[in-house]
Design a protein with these regions (language model features):
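Extended, small-residue-rich solenoid/repeat segments and analogous flexible loops
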Residues: 1-33, 37, 151-156
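Glycine-rich hexapeptide-repeat left-handed beta-helix
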Residues: 1-4, 37-45, 51-53, 62-67, ...
Length: 156
């Protein structure tokens, strides 16, 4: 069952189907696909799903995205959990059962294979993805700033 907050912005070409819950100030950008046809997809406040992303679930794995999350252009999230204040880089892929803890960055092009979990505050890069270091306070702050920038951009 769709539950879409009135302050959500869904741009032309984007598709939201199935059991999907979108909280306040979420933005779904051009040509993104959010398919909650197997299990539920929940996207938290102030999060943005950028152009050409694909969000999907499996029959065993729902998809949960926390608050202040930015999902970069053409990223794929499949049956995973993304906690608050995370940046998923462009063309990154996060697969079933994986869990990205809060205040983390998954770098552009990274492949997070099934059932992986990384510590809070990690920089996660590579194929297959691995945590290479902890983020600085400034880097963590930039994740929040980016999400807030997208909220403003979506209202123009």
């Amino acid at each position: 069952m769709k539950k879409i907050n009135p302050k959500v912005e869904i741009f032309p070409g984007a598709h939201v189907i199935g059991d999907v819950s979108l909280d306040e100030d979420v933005s779904i950008w051009y040509n993104a696909v959010v398919r909650g046809d197997n299990k539920q997809i929940v996207i938290g406040k102030n999060s943005n799903i950028q152009d050409n992303c694909v969000l999907h679930t499996s029959s065993e794995h729902p998809l949960k995205i926390g608050e202040n999350v930015s999902v970069g252009h053409a990223a794929v999230l499949h049956g995973c959990e993304i906690e608050d204040n995370v940046l998923i880089g462009m063309n990154a892929t996060v697969l079933n059962g994986s869990h990205i803890n809060k205040n983390s960055i998954v770098g552009a092009g990274a492949l997070v294979t099934e059932n992986k979990e990384f510590p809070e505050g990690s920089l996660i890069i590579g194929v297959p993805a691995r945590a290479v270091r902890q983020l600085s306070p400034e880097e963590i702050e930039s994740i929040t700033k980016n999400a807030k920038k997208y909220v403003k951009l979506s209202k123009k």
